[in-house]
Amino acid sequence: MKKQNNGLIKNPFLWLLFIFFLVTGFQYFYSGNNSGGSQQINYTELVQEITDGNVKELTYQPNGSVIEVSGVYKNPKTSKEGTGIQFFTPSVTKVEKFTSTILPADTTVSELQKLATDHKAEVTVKHESSSGIWINLLVSIVPFGILFFFLFSMMGNMGGGNGRNPMSFGRSKAKAANKEDIKVRFSDVAGAEEEKQELVEVVEFLKDPKRFTKLGARIPAGVLLEGPPGTGKTLLAKAVAGEAGVPFFSISGSDFVEMFVGVGASRVRSLFEDAKKAAPAIIFIDEIDAVGRQRGVGLGGGNDEREQTLNQLLIEMDGFEGNEGIIVIAATNRSDVLDPALLRPGRFDRKVLVGRPDVKGREAILKVHAKNKPLAEDVDLKLVAQQTPGFVGADLENVLNEAALVAARRNKSIIDASDIDEAEDRVIAGPSKKDKTVSQKERELVAYHEAGHTIVGLVLSNARVVHKVTIVPRGRAGGYMIALPKEDQMLLSKEDMKEQLAGLMGGRVAEEIIFNVQTTGASNDFEQATQMARAMVTEYGMSEKLGPVQYEGNHAMLGAQSPQKSISEQTAYEIDEEVRSLLNEARNKAAEIIQSNRETHKLIAEALLKYETLDSTQIKALYETGKMPEAVEEESHALSYDEVKSKMNDEK
């Protein structure tokens, strides 16, 4: 409770609310006390009261630009308003005094005095009170002063990392690292050998710029690292700074943009000023698309805060003043939405594509991340690399980390191949749900569904090999089949894609042939198949009818040119027809394969119902010999205590 109370006390908004009510109450009571139970009347009412002879005393007192008039009634008046704060129903009170305010015009004051004298009212004129002026001034200024104080305090807190000084709100939020603090080297970055070769010259520029400038070469102003998330763009930037031995300033693109106009541009100026003082230096901007999107094409357009920030960044990178010794390295996975002025030579001279690693790169990455993990002798990192096509560095690190967690969960002292195999499944499909209650009918349906995918994949194995099939539920899937490419592929042929389409259709076709039903289990298969078939027709020009024309590209996100419809209704209809034709062709091919291999299909399904998971060796044996490998056959016997405990640990 004490911690919660301390948090409430430190909350600036609660203090602001408290001060507001305090000042409001002070003003209210101050005005109430000054009135002393009097009634406020206007000039017309004042003249009427004097004319009626109901004024006993009248006092004039100048107060700044007005004259305050107060007086006493001869006959007190009744009022239901009263003064001060009333907590109950207001009572009828007698008002003996009144106040009014008039402008200091000579004719008005003299006429009012003459009128009061004629009606036998006692008139008194007082000099202006200096203390009253200061009190009124204080009451007017104090609330605004308190408000500004809290605003500046909150702005100082929002400045983050620059102390509590409110004037640091526009300072850069970049994290600065000295060359001694950067321990990352090129040897720590695996699977990006070509990318490192592109960055070697940048390191040489920073180490020995005279070697290049004497030949008339210009130091690159910036390097743009583009690639999918998790490929190691940030790590590469740190490695460049580490190899060059220069200070490293890192900041996210979103840190520049705030709700206050001009703050982003101020932070850009501050960042480059700090880098100039430490030159030679590297500025790393992560996710630069947050601030570098094309100007004038977002929602609302116009010269908004983001555009001002981008303009300042353009000027700093290649404006009137040079930035000798400063290299900007930026990372993004959406270079298509960046402003063309940012991508031109002179700003980002080098564009390095950091792609997904090949099998050798994946093996090297696994070796780097396995340095601090005890691995059993049966762990083959080369095999793991072959089983993880398309994985980036972050995915591979996650696989080994999950394997370590699985081994710890099973009370092991080292990580073996079964732990890594389980980790791969968890990363690809999610955690297993062995405790999930599934009816026998559904288990059979899932088994034949996955066996359908498997048998089609076994027959059409020119490009891909069936690696594993299981009916253990994981994530949203009731089961799944994994088919891996025989080797890393940069390009896919039309036949390769048709084989994949047939494999995706194998599950639904098996349901229809064996059980004569259609279930929702094939929804994800259809989604993938439709996307692939549409890409074949609209992007890759693989339709004989429509020809080698690209009808659709990558749909732009907010910040780039919005896609406009550039095809006719007839062409759109023909595209749909071609997509449907490809999918029907794949469906017929899958049906033909399953009908021709009914016995093998049944064997795989029955093995799945018995063992739940089959690896590539077991699948191959069933396909070629019709039997499971002898090593897998298990004898039925009563389990000992140690065997029961071991089995429980394996199932955790």
Curated annotation (Swiss-Prot):
Family: In the central section; belongs to the AAA ATPase family. In the C-terminal section; belongs to the peptidase M41 family.
Gene Ontology CC, one term: plasma membrane
Domain of life: Bacteria
Active site: 450
UniProt keyword Repeat present: no
Biological processes annotated in GO: protein catabolic process; proteolysis
Originating organism: Streptococcus pneumoniae (strain ATCC BAA-255 / R6)
GO molecular function: ATP binding; ATP hydrolysis activity; ATP-dependent peptidase activity; metalloendopeptidase activity; zinc ion binding
Location (main, coarse): membrane
Protein name: ATP-dependent zinc metalloprotease FtsH
Segments traversing the membrane: 12-32, 132-152
Membrane topology: Multi-pass membrane protein
Residues involved in Zn(2+) binding: 449, 453, 525
Cellular localization per UniProt: Cell membrane
